[in-house]
């Protein structure tokens, strides 16, 4: 089975690609260049050759959110997803599965929520996640769609925890990680 992955060079994408390849799947990374305006035909060819497409593309939220960077966060998620969905919807053969990332930032900042709550927050991140999911939902109704709402990635070798540990090592700033029972 061939699986195309946008965001394959990111932290989650690298680990997922390695895992899938270890299970014998043929992973096709969809690099940034494929999402340039003049590369749509090539993107379509890549998507056409796969049974599954996984969309993990998106600039890191672990930077200062200037207005320019907010636009980059938006473009790297919404524009990429829009192009992927367009490529999926123009396929000659139905795609089996489209998995598209989102984030728990979709929910309001306070309260307890799970995947059955349709209560979207009002801040920038919630609006971004909502727009991201709406783009993915424009996928043809005959394609199985899964939207995953990721939390903050915590790992010593990448993700947010690596940066937190670096700050703790080189400054007097300390981060206390809860036990998960808060």
Segments the model singles out, each with a brief description of its role:
Residues 34-83, 87:
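NAD(P)H-binding glycine-rich loop region in Rossmannoid oxidoreductase-like domains
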Residues 60, 102-106, 151-154, 171:
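Active-site segment of SDR-like NAD(P)-dependent oxidoreductases
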Residues 6, 53-57, 98-104, 148-150:
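SDR active-site strand-loop-helix element
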Residues 82-123:
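Conserved Rossmann-fold NAD(P)-dependent oxidoreductase catalytic core, especially the SDR/UDP-sugar
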Residues 15, 19, 87, 135:
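Rossmann-fold NAD(P)-dependent oxidoreductase module
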Residues 130, 144-147, 151-182:
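NAD(P)-dependent short-chain dehydrogenase/reductase
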Residues 3-21:
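N-terminal Rossmann NAD(P)H-binding glycine-rich loop of SDR-like oxidoreductase domains
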Residues 121-147:
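Active-site Tyr-X1-5-Lys
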